[in-house]
Amino acid sequence: MPERRRFERATVLWSGHLVHGDQALACLIVNISAGGAMVRTDDATICPASVTLRSARIGDLAAEVTWRKNNEMGLKFLDDDQTVAALIGKALR
């Protein structure tokens, strides 16, 4: 089956938070690309559809939840691909 992703993913284990309003849900960023990320949380069902992924390594990125399974979620970044790619590249150095 051909790969459907537009961007190459980097496997990482970065701590972060999914922020919505004044609420923040701790998460572990498992992989990341210019287009989005896969994160793990204690309970993916309590996270709203629109969030900000906050990480000390990459800052804040606006995102939409595209899928959920058990304690994992897929995020699609809403920021410009090139901007996100630059942030990720800097964090991976």
Q: PLM features: what roles do these ranges have?
A:
Residues 1-93:
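Structured alpha-helical
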